[in-house]
Amino acid sequence: MIVDSRVASLVDTNILVYCHDFTAPYKREAARDVLRRGAVNRELRIPHQAMVEFVNVTTRRRGDRDPLLPREEAWRQAEDLLNEFPVLYPNESVFRTAMLGMAAYRFAWYDAHLWAYAEHYGISEILSEDFEHGRWYGTVRVRNPFVELGLA
């Protein structure tokens, strides 16, 4: 898959999950706006990892609270994401790059894997709240859309 890194951003799981989190209404609206703009501008990419994590996170119980979504609704939302955005899949290079990211930046495994997708596919930006906002990791800059809105 060829990705135009001048316009593409990689979306982390937390952005996808916040779209359905009614306990954080401002972040929910901000996350939905990120996806709306990304769909219109065709600028967002979703890593396969985020799709897997999205279904897991939205369908599991949260302590004594119900899941964010019933299983069937999470599946429907995942289908909508698959239909709306290009999904990037891992390969050996992504895996090896993730190991380098763990060593170079001391990332946790899933963060390293997310970063590796961006490095491998030539995407210059990750949208996430799980990294340091504005920092460059190799050729990839992290942007936390919630910081920009004063929500972080």
Describe the function of each predicted region.
Residues 45-48, 127-128:
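Short beta-strand segments at enzyme active-site cores
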Residues 1-4, 115-152:
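Acidic, PIN/NYN-like endoribonuclease modules and their adjacent C-terminal/linker elements
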Residues 14, 55-56:
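Amphipathic alpha-helical repeat scaffolds of TPR domains
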Residues 3-4, 84-126:
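Active-site neighborhoods of divalent-metal-dependent phosphate/nucleic-acid chemistry enzymes
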